[in-house]
């Protein structure tokens, strides 16, 4: 990833926020996101910093050692695309072994440089469902059937 000083300030702020995200830092979400920000990922679609904060609170409750690593960031003061990996452990998934989800986020910024739209793109079937004991076998079977 380019050095943070080469990126537009809103991008640098959001990258720093995600790479240092913790239960304790969730209180800073309003510094990075607009009050009426829209957030969408494969499981959630919400508006506002309160609901966005609750998504991350649930993440910290359900997962062990969740951490984002931004691999690439491109954009300007109005929009950005981040390519990232998300590392975590879940005692109910694959015996609690480390897991990784690869994805990308599309961000749009308001006039104050805060995130007004955050859209995550990642393959829930490949990155998550295929790792679940019963569902995983079915997903892999379906994938093979569709591929031929």
What is the meaning of each model-derived region?
Residues 14, 18, 33, 56, ...:
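Hydrophobic alpha-helical core bundles mediating ligand binding, dimerization, or RNAP-core interactions
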Residues 26-80:
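A solvent-exposed, acidic/Ser-Thr-rich amphipathic alpha-helical stretch
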Residues 1-27, 31, 145-148:
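Short, low-complexity N-terminal intrinsically disordered segments enriched in polar/charged residues
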Residues 16, 20, 38-39, 91:
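General structural signal for alpha-helix termini and helix-helix connectors
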């Amino acid at each position: 990833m380019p050095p943070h000083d080469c990126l537009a300030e809103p991008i640098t702020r959001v990258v720093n926020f995600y790479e240092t995200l913790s239960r304790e830092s969730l209180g800073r979400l309003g510094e990075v996101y607009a009050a009426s920000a829209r957030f969408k990922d494969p499981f959630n679609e919400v508006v506002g910093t309160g609901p966005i904060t609750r998504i991350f609170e649930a993440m910290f409750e359900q997962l062990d050692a969740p951490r984002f690593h931004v691999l690439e960031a491109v954009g300007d003061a109005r929009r950005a695309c981040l390519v990232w990996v998300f590392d975590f452990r879940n005692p109910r998934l694959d015996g609690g072994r480390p897991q990784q989800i690869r994805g990308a986020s599309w961000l749009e910024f308001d006039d104050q440089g805060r995130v007004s739209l955050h859209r995550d793109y990642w393959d829930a079937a490949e990155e998550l469902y295929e790792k679940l004991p019963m569902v995983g076998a079915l997903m892999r079977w379906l994938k093979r059937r569709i591929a031929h």
